[in-house]
From Swiss-Prot:
Part of the 50S ribosomal subunit. SUPFAM superfamilies: Ribosomal protein L16p/L10e (SSF54686). The gene is rplP. It holds the Pfam family Ribosomal_L16. This is Large ribosomal subunit protein uL16. InterPro entries: Ribosomal_uL16 (IPR047873), Ribosomal_uL16_bact-type (IPR000114), Ribosomal_uL16_CS (IPR020798), Ribosomal_uL16_dom (IPR016180), Ribosomal_uL16_sf (IPR036920).
Length: 141
């Protein structure tokens, strides 16, 4: 599972997930990728599940780049615990996703196979996405 090696503080406040993505919103490594079209939050398990689905479909051919990293701790209190007594312990690591963010990129395989693999990955993600290529990338969200 993806998570930071160390952080300055163990726990963070929730914050707000607003606006559009101004960084990481264009294909940088591959020829085809997945772009988020709405706000959401992705955790390390979802990133890994989508990666495994893509890798199995392309039978380890080509190359996959993961363009997101979960660096925000999400806390949870144990089940059947009364409120109070402080903030819960870190449960999982997440990343806030804004519209326009590239999540995965692929290269080195034919486009039809890549589209099938990316469609499998799209079903594992908790927000709406679209498949973009280097030609279709300049379209509005």
């Amino acid at each position: 599972m993806l998570m930071p090696k160390r952080t300055k503080f163990r726990k963070q406040m929730k914050g707000r997930n607003r606006g559009k993505s101004f960084r990481g919103n264009s294909l940088a490594f591959g020829d085809i990728g997945i772009k988020a079209t709405e706000h959401g939050r992705i955790d390390s398990r979802q990133i890994e599940a989508a990666r495994i689905a893509m890798t199995r479909h392309i039978k380890r051919a080509g190359k996959i780049w993961i363009r997101v990293f979960p660096d925000k701790p999400l806390t949870a209190k144990p089940l059947e615990t009364r409120m109070g007594k402080g903030k819960g312990s870190v449960d999982k690591w997440v990343m806030n996703i804004q519209p326009g963010r590239i999540v995965y990129e692929m290269a080195g395989i034919e486009e039809e196979l890549a589209r099938e693999a990316l469609a499998l990955a799209q079903s594992k993600l908790p927000f709406k996405t679209k498949i973009v290529t280097s030609e279709s990338e300049n379209e509005i969200y």
